[in-house]
Amino acid sequence: MKNRIQQLSFFFSLFVFSTMYSQYTDIINSNKPGFSESPYSVGTGVYQFESDFFYKNTSTKPTFSKPHTFGVDLFFRTSFFLEKLEINTQLTYQRETIDNDFNDGLSKFTLGAKYLLFEPVYKDATKEIRSWKKQNTFDKRRLIPSVGLYIGMHTDFLDTIHKKNSMSPKVGVLLQHNLTNNLNIVSNVFYDKIGTNSSEIYYVISTTQNFGYRWSGSIEYQEIFNKQQ
């Protein structure tokens, strides 16, 4: 028997609103806010830290308890060898409250890597100086997504209550459609906690529109299919 968890999220952000960075570049390549992940690396020689806070009030089982979870995600990204290859680490520290009982500690410590397998090349419409139509016609090649592959491993260096006494892999396919210079759609499919009783398959779709140098808005949908423990 499987559980289905659906989540719809809206984000309206002002530059560095819900994410903190330690980086100096002209353009920040971030996966935050939200849960989707771009197939693109941060680039060689970049050391980037991202973080956000979360609050969950959900229950995947028909019980009378009302679990609440509050925590922080820490994400470190860098690239040592290749422009297309990124090495990353994700840590999650959370506090769970069920009725009058609570526990807190490190609930996730994941080491991962992603590689950009394919990136389409688009027409440079600005060079079409003699034709307004060619300058403004939609480039059908933008329907072809950039493709990335993610491989990660959940370690067991966790707080006692979250320990599984084993490690488990995570794999995913990362897609990004750049429909315009300011509008993109990111789609992810992951197979997580492979080989465990809590293994799950989930997908995330997020659309982001840039309104200017500082403002952007996004909408995201996530659905999770997991085993019932």
Language model features with spans:
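Bacterial Sec-dependent N-terminal signal peptides
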Residues: M1-I28
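Transmembrane beta-barrel domains of Gram-negative outer membranes and organellar outer membranes
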Residues: Q23-Q229
